[in-house]
Amino acid sequence: MATTTTTTTARFSDSYEFSNTSGNSFFAAESSLDYPTEFLTPPEVSALKLLSNCLESVFDSPETFYSDAKLVLAGGREVSFHRCILSARIPVFKSALATVKEQKSSTTVKLQLKEIARDYEVGFDSVVAVLAYVYSGRVRSPPKGASACVDDDCCHVACRSKVDFMVEVLYLSFVFQIQELVTLYERQFLEIVDKVVVEDILVIFKLDTLCGTTYKKLLDRCIEIIVKSDIELVSLEKSLPQHIFKQIIDIREALCLEPPKLERHVKNIYKALDSDDVELVKMLLLEGHTNLDEAYALHFAIAHCAVKTAYDLLELELADVNLRNPRGYTVLHVAAMRKEPKLIISLLMKGANILDTTLDGRTALVIVKRLTKADDYKTSTEDGTPSLKGGLCIEVLEHEQKLEYLSPIEASLSLPVTPEELRMRLLYYENRVALARLLFPVETETVQGIAKLEETCEFTASSLEPDHHIGEKRTSLDLNMAPFQIHEKHLSRLRALCKTVELGKRYFKRCSLDHFMDTEDLNHLASVEEDTPEKRLQKKQRYMELQETLMKTFSEDKEECGKSSTPKPTSAVRSNRKLSHRRLKVDKRDFLKRPYGNGD
């Protein structure tokens, strides 16, 4: 006679779910039947809680409890786990671990998450949340910074950080085939989805592509919200899977909620922008059928086109940067939603009003803050590593909001009087921008793009050699050219360099290089709050080592220049033996291992 295995599940609350299985492991992956908790006696409930707590402590302290494998996430971060537990709980892990070959018996097994979850990159906190449930059968609250945005006035119930976190855990629950977690998280998401900003609703539709119809209830509710919203058709078409876009159009038609259709001339402008053809846009405007404001072309370019295309369209200065689209968004609001610092700075320089609010009272700064995860914003990056764009946008907008008067960038540039002064200033600014590019790559790329530095010719130390590139195509400026031509080309380079430096000083004050380039007294560089005399001395010594490295490089290049038939006098070194004003090759490691911070 066959033996029937009975499975019971006790749910104590929305955050607890335990399986009490007769004849199977507690962590059996099979689905279970639901029974009221009163079927379990108090001692049984206490025993299950104790077991859950013990297993959760095993996960939270993996090294203490002899974990034997690591899950490697994108970026190299690792989560320790126990193969026996995950193999029993998640069939996908059992299959993946079976294919892993250990090189040595003592070597910890490492499993790449991308080999299991191939279609979407998930964060550390999402992985920990799902694996904690696998161990304990209990849904734990995520760390505050993992599902909270930067805005202190936000309740963090339905902001973008919360949406991103929920999408990630829903995806992992689907990939790991944990049906009970799929149900729990979908139910939680349905409780908050009505509070989500309509632009963030579009993010949820990723689940359709990733998980098919697994989250049909959630996706159907999102479709209902989008149908009744005023979001533009062009945004829907570019953001949604084609079948969902068509479904929304059909429902709107049935409910007589169709928005006005775009005119043919506006569509042509959008097509030209999609093709990154700003020249074609100019030709279409000459026909006189419409203009950039009537077509909301700048809004479209900022939202959907390449950064260069949007920047080139803005540089035409044919559109009102403070114009609101039918949904009440200015161009700056749209740039904030995109979290692109170059576009935000460009708009501010063109006169965009940072204090303009959306119809629901959000400024551009609030928009960016609610799109940026708190953990990402609070995590400081080391010099030389890329900064996150969300944090840069917040930095720019916060600084700009404090300014009472925005002086023109060009006002700080006084033209050099003599060729020697021009050469000295070029060498100084080339040095400064090169160092900034080394230490703050994203910030420098942002401001030098606005200053159009790449459109000018770099001035290098080799340009000082009289016989440089004789008989070859010139790739940098040559001082043997006619004086007027030299002066004009160098002035263009100097203007771009100065504008790059001034933009960096204005919008990224923490990236100041004054303590490298212009310090007359090293004592003030070493004087930092909470420093000890020993630390100040160490900093001062390290600074002197850097100067010696740079001076040694200069001396070697000077000897090479001296071998030429017509040596030229040089003033590349200040009389006080400060940093040499020339374009130098510097080792990134020399700066990354210095003991002091960025400072102003």
From Swiss-Prot:
BP GO terms, sorted: defense response to bacterium; innate immune response; protein ubiquitination; regulation of defense response; regulation of jasmonic acid mediated signaling pathway; regulation of salicylic acid mediated signaling pathway; systemic acquired resistance, salicylic acid mediated signaling pathway
Gene Ontology CC terms, in alphabetical order: cytoplasm; nuclear body
Annotated stretches, region: Disordered: 554-600
Polar residues: bias regions: 563-574
S-nitrosocysteine, modified sites: C155
One Pfam family linked to the record: DUF3420
InterPro entries: Ankyrin_rpt (IPR002110), Ankyrin_rpt-contain_sf (IPR036770), BTB/POZ_dom (IPR000210), NPR (IPR044292), NPR1/NIM1-like_C (IPR021094), NPR_central_dom (IPR024228), SKP1/BTB/POZ_sf (IPR011333)
Entries under SUPFAM superfamilies matching the protein: Ankyrin repeat (SSF48403), POZ domain (SSF54695)
Modified sites of kind Phosphoserine: S15, S19
PROSITE patterns, per the entry: ANK_REP_REGION (PS50297), ANK_REPEAT (PS50088), BTB (PS50097), ZF_C2HC_NPR (PS52046)
Keyword Zinc: yes
Region span, Salicylic acid-binding core (SBC): 386-523
Binding-site list for salicylate: R432
Subunit structure: Interacts with NPR1 independently of SA.
Role: Salicylic acid (SA)-binding substrate-specific adapter of an E3 ubiquitin-protein ligase complex (CUL3-RBX1-BTB) which mediates the ubiquitination and subsequent proteasomal degradation of target proteins.
Domain notes: The BTB/POZ domain mediates the interaction with some component of ubiquitin ligase complexes.
Protein's name in the database: Regulatory protein NPR2
Native organism: Arabidopsis thaliana (Mouse-ear cress)
Gene that produces this protein: NPR2
